[in-house]
C-alpha cells in the first residue's frame, strides 16, 4: 500500500511540476504576446499620428491654397472694379466739361477726324446745346484752310450717343463718341491706369 501511495505522490508531484511549468510557459508566452502587442500598438499609434499629421498638413495646405486663390480672385475683382471706375470717371469728366472746354475739345476732334470735310455729324440731343451751328462754322473755316471741303453739317439721324460724335459720309463712318474712344484705347491705357492705381 505504501508503494502505491508513493507512486501516487510521485504522480501528483510530477503533475504539479508539469502544471507549474505549463503555467510558467503560458505566463511567459502571454507576457511576450502582450509586449509584442504593446509594441505594435505603439507603432500603429505612431503611424496613425504620422498619417493624421500628413493628412492635417495636406488639408491645411489645401485650405490655404483655396483661401489664397479666393483672396487673389477678390483682389483682382476689386482691382478690375477700380479700373472700371477710373474709366467711368474719365468719361463722366469728359461729359461734364464746361461748355467752352467741351466745344474746344470737339472742335479739335472734328478737325482730326474729318476725311475730306464733306461729312455729316451725328450728335446726342443733350449735346446740341454745346455742339452748335456756330461751332461747325468755325470747324468748316479751319477745314477750308487745310484744303478740305469745309462742309461738315448736322445729320438728321439720331443715335444713342452719350458724348462725342459720329462723322458720316457716303462711304465711311468715323466713331468719335467718348465711350467708343475709351473702349478702343482701354487695352493700351488699362496697364498704365493699373500702374497708377496699384503702384507698389
Swiss-Prot record:
Keywords: ATP synthesis, Hydrogen ion transport, Ion transport, Transport. Gene3D superfamilies: ATP synthase, E subunit, C-terminal, F1F0 ATP synthase subunit B, membrane domain. Produces ATP from ADP in the presence of a proton gradient across the membrane. GO terms for molecular function: ATP binding; proton-transporting ATP synthase activity, rotational mechanism; proton-transporting ATPase activity, rotational mechanism. GO terms for cellular component: proton-transporting two-sector ATPase complex, catalytic domain. It comes from Thermoanaerobacter pseudethanolicus (strain ATCC 33223 / 39E) (Clostridium thermohydrosulfuricum). Belongs to the V-ATPase E subunit family. This is V-type proton ATPase subunit E. The keyword Nuclease does not apply. It comes from the Bacteria. InterPro entries: ATPase_E_C, ATPase_V1_Esu.
Amino acid at each position: 500500500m505504501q508503494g502505491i501511495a508513493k507512486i501516487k505522490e510521485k504522480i501528483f508531484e510530477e503533475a504539479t511540476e508539469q502544471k507549474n511549468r505549463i503555467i510558467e510557459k503560458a505566463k511567459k508566452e502571454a507576457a511576450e504576446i502582450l509586449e509584442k502587442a504593446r509594441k505594435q500598438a505603439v507603432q500603429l499609434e505612431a503611424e496613425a499620428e504620422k498619417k493624421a499629421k500628413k493628412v492635417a498638413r495636406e488639408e491645411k495646405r489645401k485650405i490655404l491654397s483655396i483661401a489664397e486663390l479666393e483672396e487673389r480672385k477678390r483682389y483682382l475683382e476689386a482691382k478690375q472694379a477700380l479700373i472700371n471706375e477710373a474709366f467711368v470717371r474719365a468719361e463722366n469728366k469728359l461729359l461734364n466739361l464746361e461748355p467752352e472746354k467741351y466745344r474746344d475739345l470737339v472742335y479739335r476732334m472734328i478737325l482730326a477726324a474729318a476725311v475730306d470735310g464733306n461729312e455729316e455729324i451725328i450728335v446726342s440731343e443733350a449735346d446740341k446745346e454745346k455742339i452748335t451751328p456756330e461751332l461747325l462754322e468755325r470747324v468748316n473755316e479751319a477745314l477750308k484752310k487745310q484744303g478740305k471741303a469745309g462742309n461738315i453739317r448736322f445729320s438728321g439721324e439720331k443715335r444713342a450717343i452719350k458724348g462725342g460724335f459720329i462723322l458720316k459720309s457716303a462711304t465711311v463712318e468715323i466713331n468719335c463718341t467718348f465711350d467708343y474712344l475709351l473702349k478702343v484705347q482701354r487695352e493700351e491705357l488699362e496697364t498704365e491706369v493699373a500702374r497708377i492705381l496699384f503702384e507698389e
